[in-house]
Design a protein with these regions (language model features):
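Arg/Lys-rich amphipathic alpha helix in sigma70-family domain 2
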Residues: 61-68, 78-99, 116, 168, ...
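Internal acidic/polar
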Residues: 4-8, 94-120, 147
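C-terminal edge and immediately downstream basic/flexible tail or linker adjoining helix-turn-helix-like DNA-binding
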Residues: 2, 116-129, 153-156, 171-188
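Short, charged helix-capping/linker segments at alpha-helix termini
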Residues: 2, 16-25, 35-54, 188
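Amphipathic, Lys/Arg- and hydrophobic-enriched alpha-helical face
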Residues: 27-45, 62, 77, 127, ...
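Helix-turn-helix DNA-binding module
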Residues: 124-128, 132-136, 140-161
Length: 188
């Protein structure tokens, strides 16, 4: 069986036994997700990549602490989120760039590109105003597709707290995005 076809639990056990290739496979599986979470916290791809690398190295150093009865992905993403939060506290990084999951799949025309940039900027600004835990919860839930229970495990908070954070984040995002839609309709 090729390494990429091996279940997370088996790869994690092999990584705990010192198999770096197994750990590398796990990192590859969750790297994009981990980077998006780091970017939601930090706001730009360069800092997010650095925080993700910090988190991946910290997870490798502490692989022995991983509980094989729990999912590996949320464990790794939580470590990356903690690394991103540490980096943000140290550098006081502000969100300044676009959020990549919002990029469109098709090639848009110039007017559509401008509209998408304006929407992204409005969303970025609104996300930047949210408390960090709400921002991470709403990105994990609405962008990454995590369940409330998975987010609770990742963030180390009760599931009810996650539900509340997602609710309040969505409510906080609703007004700025509605204002953007109203502006867009007037422009049309």
């Amino acid at each position: 069986m090729r390494t990429k076809d091996v279940p997370d639990a088996e790869l994690a056990a092999r990584a705990q036994a010192g198999d770096r290739e197994a750990y590398g496979t796990l990192v590859m599986r969750y790297a994009a997700q981990a980077r998006r979470v780091a970017r939601a916290i930090l706001g730009n791809p360069e800092d997010a990549d650095d925080a993700a690398q910090d988190g991946f190295l910290a997870a490798l150093r502490h692989i022995g602490r991983y509980d094989p009865d729990r999912p590996f992905g949320p464990w790794l993403v939580r470590i990356v989120a903690n690394a991103a939060a540490d980096r943000r506290r140290r550098r006081k990084v502000r969100r300044t760039e676009e959020l990549s999951p919002l990029a469109a799949a098709s090639a848009p025309g110039p007017g559509e590109v401008t509209d998408r940039r304006a929407l992204r900027a409005a969303l970025e600004a609104a996300l930047a105003e949210l408390p960090e835990r709400q921002r991470v919860a709403v990105v994990l839930f609405d962008v990454e597709g995590y369940s409330h229970a998975e987010i609770a495990g990742t963030l180390g908070v009760p599931e009810g707290t996650v539900r509340s954070d997602v609710f309040h984040a969505r409510r906080a995002l609703r007004e700025p995005l509605a204002a953007w839609r109203t502006w867009k309709e007037r422009e049309s």
